[in-house]
Each structure stands twice: as C-alpha cells, then as structure tokens.
C-alpha cells in the first residue's frame, strides 16, 4: 500500500467497504485488521467451530430454566428494545468513521445488524443468570462470554484492555470537539467534530446503549476518545458486563439492550429453533447517516440521530 497515491488509497478504502457483501471480495488487495466476510460466510465458519459445543438440554419446547426464569421472561415482555445502529459502507460521507472503527477492529459492530426474534432474545436474557458462560435456548446450551463475543464478532485479541473509564473527561471533550469545548461545563453534543458526531450515534446504539443520562454521556465520550486514539479495548468484556447488568434490572421503563447482537451471537452458533407463536423478526439495524444527510435526524443537547 506504500506505493499508492492518496486518491487511489481513498478509492481502495471505499471499494473494500462497498464489496463486503458483494461478489468481488477475493479481488481487492487492501489489508485490514479484520478480514471482511459476508454474513453467510461467517455463519458457515462459526457453526463449524461451535458444532461440538452446543449441548442439548431437553427438547425444543424447553424455553425456560425454571419457574423464576419464566417469571422474569413475562416481565421482559413488557419492555421494549434499543435497536442497534448500522452504517452503510457505500456512503462516502462515512469514510472517516469507518476508518476509526476499522482501526480498532470493531467493523462488525456496525455491519450485518440483522433483525432479531423478540421471544428468543427475551428467553436468552431470562435464562442467562442460571448458567455460567452461556444460556439455555429452546433445548440447547448456547455459549456466551467475553471471549465468545470477541470470536464471533471477529474482534482481534486484546491482551491488555485499555482502561477507558479512567480517561480524563476534559481531555476527551477537548479532543472530540477540536478544542471548541474544554470541559463538561457548556458542552453540547453538537460541538463534536462531524465524524465524532456520527461516532457518538454508533456508540449510543451499538457500544454503550442506554438512557441518555449525563453519566452515560460522559462514559460514551470517554470510550469514544479511547477509540479515536486507537486504544485496544476488550469489546467482548464491554458487551458482556452490560448484558449481565441488564439481567438484574427490573424497571419496566428500561429498554433491553443489544438485541441484534445477542440474536446474531446465537445464530452464528446454531439456528435457534422457531416455535408456534414466534413473531416475525423485527428491529433491522437503524441506519446512521453522515452529518450532511437529510436523514441525520434532530440535533440537540442529548440526541444526534
């Protein structure tokens, strides 16, 4: 790549993202930290790897570990979902954002964000507290751990995860706003530089989803700073901790997070059996647009997309 001029470099990057799910994959030469594969290819490879780890536990009709799990499931039916965000790799306006995400190997957190079966996701959440490193899903034990998340999301191995929660907030804000703001006082999300406004939308839906409290906003800014500085972060641990914390929340007003990712992790291991009464899949990834697009949505203190 060293002999490429800048214009050809841009064309190469745009092409490699636009060809992820097309037929040209074997022809492009760009070396990425993460090999780009179609979702079908990912399914075939991962199911082959996990074929010997999915243990049967009863029949398809066994949806809950015990009565307590059944009770939890019923309460989960009263709660909605935070559908994750997706980026269109063909959108040239997202070039800078894709580069940042690809540099840390998190490309698949914004790609292949497919619809999910609500009942299966709720069953997973209700059952996971009763098993170590996995959950019962309709008569089978599916694995769920930080290492499994990283493996299935094709996240590069991280030996020592950067402690992003310790990032100095003022330093993060100064960097992400290009010096327009020096700290939390007077800070507004619209002060973020354009690529970082898009990155914030990714963060609030796909990395640190949840209520838009000041505490959560600060956490997102710290994580974004670490990401833009190409710090190595254990994505699997990041997601795992949030999912486990979610299983302890009983507030019916709190939406369930990571539904697309949870369902994807299950499907990548083994097709979840469908049962009578299952709804059609819902919640295809919400498109996140570049800042110049008409679809970028309302802007304000707390919402960017």
Task: Explain the meaning of each model-derived region.
Residues 2-300:
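A structural signal for long, well-ordered, hydrophobic/aromatic- and basic-residue-enriched core segments
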């Amino acid at each position: 790549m060293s002999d490429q001029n800048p214009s050809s470099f841009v064309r190469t990057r745009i092409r490699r993202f636009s060809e992820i799910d097309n037929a040209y994959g074997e022809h492009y030469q760009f070396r990425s930290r993460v090999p780009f594969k179609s979702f079908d290819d990912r399914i075939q490879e991962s199911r082959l790897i996990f074929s010997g780890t999915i243990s049967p536990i009863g029949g398809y009709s066994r949806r809950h570990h015990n009565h307590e799990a059944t009770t939890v499931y019923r309460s989960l039916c009263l709660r909605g979902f935070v559908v994750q965000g997706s980026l269109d790799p063909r959108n040239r306006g997202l070039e800078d954002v894709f580069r940042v995400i690809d540099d840390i190997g998190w490309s698949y957190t914004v790609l292949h964000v497919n619809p999910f079966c609500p009942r299966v996701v709720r069953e997973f959440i209700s059952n996971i507290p009763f098993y170590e490193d996995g959950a019962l899903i309709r008569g089978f034990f599916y694995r769920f751990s930080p290492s499994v998340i990283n493996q299935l999301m094709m996240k590069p191995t991280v030996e020592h995860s950067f402690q992003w929660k310790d990032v100095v907030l003022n330093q993060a804000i100064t960097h992400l706003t290009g010096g327009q703001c020096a700290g939390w006082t007077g800070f507004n999300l619209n002060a973020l530089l354009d690529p970082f406004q898009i990155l914030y939308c990714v963060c609030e839906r796909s990395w640190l989803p949840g209520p838009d409290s000041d505490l959560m906003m600060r956490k997102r800014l710290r994580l974004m700073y670490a990401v833009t500085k190409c710090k190595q972060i254990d994505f699997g641990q990041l997601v795992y901790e949030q999912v486990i914390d979610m299983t302890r929340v009983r507030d019916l007003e709190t939406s369930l997070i990571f539904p697309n990712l949870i369902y994807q992790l299950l499907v990548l291991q083994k097709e979840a059996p469908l049962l009578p009464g299952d709804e059609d899949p819902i919640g295809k990834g919400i498109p996140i647009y570049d800042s110049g697009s008409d679809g970028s949505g309302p802007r304000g203190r707390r919402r960017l997309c």
